[in-house]
Regions:
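Metabolite-binding pocket within alpha/beta catalytic cores that recognizes anionic/polar moieties
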Residues: 1-142
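Generic structural signal for well-ordered, non-membrane alpha-helical segments
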Residues: 28, 32-35, 71-78, 133, ...
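Glycine-rich beta-alpha junction loops
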Residues: 32, 100, 161-166, 191, ...
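Active-site rim beta-loop-alpha module in soluble metabolic enzymes
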Residues: 131-180
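A C-terminal functional module that forms or caps the active site or interfaces directly
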Residues: 171-212
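His/Asp/Glu-rich mid-to-C-terminal helical/loop segments that flank catalytic regions of hydrolases
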Residues: 215-254
Length: 254
């Protein structure tokens, strides 16, 4: 049975969205609560659908039609979100997430814009073999960098690691990644990049750093105001990047 083929152009099983419900441009936070924060930046924001961990809002930012859909935590649910959004017309995706840095030069409140992700997860291996790279769309990466620079936000461009097991990352494991020059960790981006590539979509990620696992700064400090600031900056940069891409501002256009 071709589940994907059967759901093209239909109301989607998990996200409960159908044709016409979503825009070409989509922001993908993990947290449903972050969808509400994104909606605060949108004109005419309205709730489109909610089912399980998937909350979807739609509105406009600087004239650009934008959808925000939460993916939940991890690659399996992120893959479902991307597939189902693409089935009903979404084409450009920017993940707006949080991240734990392992590069000691990356501070809480900074942004990380990945140019690649190590596939330390299981979902992408159902799509492509070992050794296949997980890389974002260059035009979107450039638009994110330009947006961060325009706002004067401190950002880092580099490789991240997408991991499955939040509590199983040992000090030795993190040190090995740090020696490779890995900037930070997340739990969704590598699968986002792989699925987008296979489906002919555009995808990138911007991450707000909420802790540094090497220095210990911010680890589990849930009330740290820098966490909220990091998320706000990531949202702003992602929205501005979409506006730049829509205008064709040197990033390929939509």
């Amino acid at each position: 049975m071709d589940k994907r083929g059967m759901s093209l152009g239909a109301r989607q099983y998990h996200l409960a969205v159908g044709p016409g419900d979503v825009s070409e441009c989509v922001l993908l936070p993990g947290d449903p609560g972050r969808v509400l924060k994104i909606a605060e930046f949108l004109e005419g924001a309205r709730k489109v659908a909610e089912n399980r961990e998937f909350l979807t809002y739609r509105g406009t930012y600087r004239g650009v039609d934008v959808t925000a859909t939460s993916t939940g935590i991890g690659c399996p649910s992120a893959a479902i979100a991307i597939e189902e959004l693409a089935n009903v017309g979404a084409r450009v995706f920017i993940r707006v997430g949080t991240s734990g840095a392992i590069d000691p030069e990356v501070s809480v409140g900074d942004l990380v814009i990945p140019v690649g992700a190590i596939r330390n997860e299981g979902t992408s291996y159902y799509y492509v073999p070992e050794g296949f790279p997980a890389v974002p769309d260059f035009g979107l990466v450039r638009a994110l960098v330009e947006a961060a620079e325009e706002r004067g936000y401190r950002y880092h461009v580099g490789v991240i690691s997408t991991d499955d097991a939040f509590y199983a990352e040992t000090p030795d494991y993190l040190e090995d990644l740090r020696k490779l020059g890995v900037k930070s960790l997340d739990m969704e981006s590598s699968t986002l990049f792989v699925v987008a590539h296979l489906r002919g979509l555009r995808a990138a990620t911007v991450l707000g750093v909420v802790a540094n696992l090497t220095t210990g700064d911010g680890v589990f400090a849930v009330e740290d105001p820098r966490r909220a600031e990091a998320v706000r900056r990531a949202i702003e940069v992602a929205l501005e990047a979409l506006a730049r891409v829509k205008e064709g501002g040197g990033a390929g256009g939509i």
